From Swiss-Prot:
Protein name: UPF0512 protein X
Family per similarity comment: Belongs to the UPF0512 family.
Lineage: Eukaryota, Amoebozoa, Evosea, Eumycetozoa, Dictyostelia
């Protein structure tokens, strides 16, 4: 099972939004604005608390 599928499954079973689950995995643990996904590797790491460069939008569409 891929990470994205796992996140979707957890979201569906718990009612916690995928955005919140992803945010909890970022370095700040904050799911506001565009988040850092540098923990996945190969991403630009933009985002964090309430901001971001918008380059990670495809992450949501992948879930």
């Amino acid at each position: 099972m891929t990470l994205f599928n796992s996140i979707s499954s957890i979201s569906n079973s718990t009612g916690i939004s995928k955005e919140s689950l992803i945010g909890n995995l970022n370095s700040n643990g904050i799911a506001t604005g565009n988040i850092s996904v540098s923990w996945l590797g190969g991403f630009d790491g933009c985002g964090g608390c309430g901001g971001g460069c918008g380059k990670n939008d495809f992450l949501y569409s992948s879930l």
